[in-house]
């Protein structure tokens, strides 16, 4: 068997947007991914589901998997002919032991590549509003490890650092803070020299402390600063508040529970993240196509009988057209059939399969879709309703009351799931979660089913529409309703939620 390949990929300090294009490309091709604690969950989610994931869990002062063992894991997996990605927080060669990991690969003639990563020494400062250099304050940057090798002692040339008058950055130095600050003071640095700590830099739970060399240690104790944290010393730290941008985002640090199915949550999660929020993905439902769907089979066999097809979700569109394709059919069989969609996102999904919706109501719900179709359907035209197995009867009732012929074909079941419910329950009980988003009545039902005996009074639900709000009201949840039944409108409601409009 031919040898495999190993890539040391810098994952950056946490924000998934900071991994390089090359790093993401290699990660998408991985057979095996070896990663540790400093790699954020957002980047771990980028690992292909087909790849073997090996968590070596290295933490400050606690290395459950020794470095020598990690080196051998990389070697063994590559000798199996696999493409191995060693995913490392920050940059592999900035105190990342990347050189140590390459030595064994080099000795065994294993092909390798190193992809640089954005180091926290610069990125965490940037997200804290601190420029690493500024011509009015300094012209050099010095990155120092604040963590001694196992069995060794730190030996930092404080006098030389002090004389350079540059920005000093200590990585992994939170446990050595007293030694570092006293070392600088004893070397003659003024106690009022600006200094800062950025904890969890570039992440939604980032915290920042700006003080002086003389006060940083005490204030860090008071704030209970924890790893990962970087320490910066220099006049540039005085610019932190002036240049702060990340922590001034409108939803910065706000934990928001997202209950959509995994395959549908991406847009909402990404938009929340861009606003500084910390979205917590907790899919409460999963969409499962109905197997051996006889009703769908007969509908597709007689598809030309229908003057209109009504599609009520993105999932329904995907399942319907996947089924058509599986039978050797495509959109051409719908040449004489009009299509109605329940909302803008459903219409967009239809456009992605090459078709344009003939009708989408201004108010995005089944009732208004049916009312619009009742006005448009021709005499003796038959309507095909494609929706979920458990769905509102609004469309059926309105078509029936207007004497419109129809067939209803359920395309999928909506199952409740509760993965990681204990973690979410703890966050709710401890008051860490403030808001929860519901994009359908079924997400409300699924959430409630997984939260038995958990007090929910501290949560405010943001509902995509009135039907969803009715479900929230049924369980006495505090809620607000988006002005329009869209993700963007839900986000607008989150941005204004402090102003009220909360119905008990």
Swiss-Prot record:
Tagged with keyword Methyltransferase: yes
Residue span of region Uroporphyrinogen-III C-methyltransferase: 1-248
Biological-process GO terms, alphabetical: cobalamin biosynthetic process; methylation; siroheme biosynthetic process
Catalytic activity entry: uroporphyrinogen III + 2 S-adenosyl-L-methionine = precorrin-2 + 2 S-adenosyl-L-homocysteine + H(+); hydroxymethylbilane = uroporphyrinogen III + H2O
Entry EC number(s): 2.1.1.107, 4.2.1.75
Gene Ontology terms, MF aspect: uroporphyrin-III C-methyltransferase activity; uroporphyrinogen-III synthase activity
Pfam family, one: HEM4
Region (Uroporphyrinogen-III synthase): 249-504
Record PANTHER family: S-ADENOSYL-L-METHIONINE-DEPENDENT UROPORPHYRINOGEN III METHYLTRANSFERASE, CHLOROPLASTIC, SIROHEME SYNTHASE-RELATED
Family: In the N-terminal section; belongs to the precorrin methyltransferase family.
NCBIfam families: cobA_cysG_Cterm, PRK06136.1
Name recorded for this polypeptide: Porphyrin biosynthesis protein HemD
Annotated source species: Ruminiclostridium josui (Clostridium josui)
Origin organism lineage: Bacteria, Bacillati, Bacillota, Clostridia, Eubacteriales
